[in-house]
Each structure stands twice: as C-alpha cells, then as structure tokens.
C-alpha cells in the first residue's frame, strides 16, 4: 500500500506571533479513514487548506499521490469546505452538469442515486432547500467524485 499523503517538515503560522505548525511530519497511507480532532484554533482547517492548496506552508513539503500540491494533486482530491458555497439560484441538476464538466472523475449516476436515497429532487433550486439538505447536496457532489483523497472540513458541524 502506497502513501496517499506525505507531509515533511511543514511550518505554518499567521503573522509573527501565531505559529500553527513548527515541524509537522505526517504520512497517511491509502485506504484509511482519518479524522482530525482538536480544539478550535488548533490548526485542523489550516492543515486541510494546505492539503487542498488554498494555503501554502512557509517551509517544508506536502505531497499527495507523489505530487507537490498543485494541478496534479487537485485532480485526485475532492474537497468539502466548512461552508456551503454553491449559487442558491442553480437547480441541483445544473450543479451536477457543472461538476460533470469540471471533474473528469465525477460520477453522475452516483450523484443521482444518492439524491434519490435522500429524497432530494434534482429539479429544485438550492434556495428552496433547508440548510440541512443544502449541506447534503454539497456532500453528494463531493462524494460523487472518484477521487483518491476526500478532504472534508467539519462535515457534521
């Protein structure tokens, strides 16, 4: 089994006084489900944002499937941010089409199957859904990719 994520000597902070990671080293093998636990402000979201390329480490390296974080790694990572980010005026079916166009590994059948199981009508706009159903749609979209790494930031918050 190969390593999915390799983090080596990572340093990350905010400003001069807030160091989040000093010398972070971490190896995550394929085929595992890993949860990050810790109090608010402990660096969970910072680590997630570095994994998906939204933040850069000051020092050290992060490799996913052998590649530095960048276009090659983004092609194999499916990311669920902590906040809903979809345009509320889109129909869910339009969202599926956007994901299908944008991600080569998006499985449209999987998305519609999950919607059916959760009684979510793909012809509804997101605006008409409850907050919980909006979050379910976002999770469906992320999990309908055939990614090698799923990164979920506060999926059950």
What are these regions (language model features)?
Residues 1-23, 30:
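A short, flexible loop at the N-terminus of ABC-type nucleotide-binding domains that lies
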Residues 35, 77-82:
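ABC nucleotide-binding domain signature
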Residues 37-39:
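The feature captures the beta-strand-to-loop junction immediately N-terminal to the Walker
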Residues 52:
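Helix-to-loop junction immediately C-terminal to a conserved catalytic motif
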Residues 60-73:
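Conserved ABC transporter NBD signature motif
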Residues 83-141:
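ABC-family P-loop ATPase nucleotide-binding domains
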Residues 144-147:
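Conserved signature/switch motifs of ABC ATPase nucleotide-binding domains
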Residues 150-154:
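Catalytic Walker B motif of ABC-type/P-loop ATPase nucleotide-binding domains
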């Amino acid at each position: 089994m190969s390593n999915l994520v390799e983090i080596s000597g990572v340093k990350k902070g905010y400003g001069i006084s807030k160091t989040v990671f000093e010398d972070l080293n971490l190896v995550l093998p394929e085929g595992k489900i890993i949860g990050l636990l810790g109090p608010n402000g402990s660096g969970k979201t910072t680590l997630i944002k570095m994994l998906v390329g939204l933040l850069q480490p000051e020092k050290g390296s992060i490799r996913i499937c052998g590649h530095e974080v960048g276009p090659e790694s983004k092609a194999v990572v499916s990311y669920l941010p902590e906040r809903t980010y979809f345009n509320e005026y889109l129909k869910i079916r339009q969202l599926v089409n956007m994901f299908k166009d944008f991600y080569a590994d998006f499985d449209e059948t999987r998305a519609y199957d999950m919607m059916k199981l959760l009684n979510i009508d793909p012809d509804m706009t997101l605006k008409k859904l409850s907050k919980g159903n909006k979050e379910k749609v976002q999770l469906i979209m992320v999990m309908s990719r055939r990614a090698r790494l799923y990164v979920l930031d506060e999926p059950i918050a």
